[in-house]
Amino acid sequence: MARIVLWRHGQTDWNTVNRFQGHTDIPLNSVGLFQAQHAARELAALKPTAIIASDLLRTQQTAQALSELLNLPVQLDPRLRETHGGSWEGRTGDENRKEDGENFTRWLTGGDIPAGRTGESRSQVAARAVAAINEALLVQHETVVFVTHGGTSRCILGELLDLPVEKWGILGGLANASWSILETHQNHISGKWLLVEHNAGTIPEPQMGDFDGDVNA
């Protein structure tokens, strides 16, 4: 059996104002650091064999909390980064609705279009992130924690559960420092994945669970 944990990073200051982070390298705030430590104590009970994180600071800081408990190194993979948001990065949801309303609304409601016109589509994010997971599972066959982002985790879930991209929005977004768990008893590349937990964790400062949750990922 292979088991993967998709763990979203803790809160940042940009999360609190719904500002699109994307590839912008924003650190955790004090709440986010607390969330990471709190969640790490629960995730340690799963006895993961590897921790693999996006190379952005907010995910590295989150992963470090679990690394210190388990004495496991954090492996970095930029393919686990958040969606590149193009012109939307650094702007709030309200600003993007005002300045690029038609495209932003289409993207929020599930359109598989480039974020911020020059950024990534959801299918592009899923392709790179799932490739990273598949490669990791070639050498790690037990429980692997992937520390990633709200938008990216939704794309991974949609792809692994074989949902059409326009339906990925039915998967509520992960709150900061919360996680989802998937398992397969088959080949991890060609087999079926089962979602056994979603948005798990008892973490303060919950975030939005609809497509708007991608904005402050």
Feature locations, PLM:
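Generic beta-sheet signal
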Residues: 4, 142-148
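Short glycine-enriched, charge-decorated loop/helix-capping segments at active-site entrances
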Residues: 19-27, 91-93, 112, 212
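Glycine-rich phosphate-binding loop signature in dinucleotide/nucleotide-binding domains
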Residues: 44-47, 136-142
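General small-molecule cofactor/ligand-binding pocket signal
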Residues: 5, 75-77, 196
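Acidic, low-complexity terminal tails and accessory targeting/binding regions
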Residues: 2, 83-95, 158-217
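Short glycine/proline- and acidic residue-enriched helix-loop micro-motifs
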Residues: 102-124
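Phosphate-coordination/substrate-recognition cap region in phosphate-metabolizing enzymes
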Residues: 39-105
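Loop-to-helix element that buttresses phosphate recognition and phosphoryl-transfer chemistry
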Residues: 4-5, 11-66, 116-130
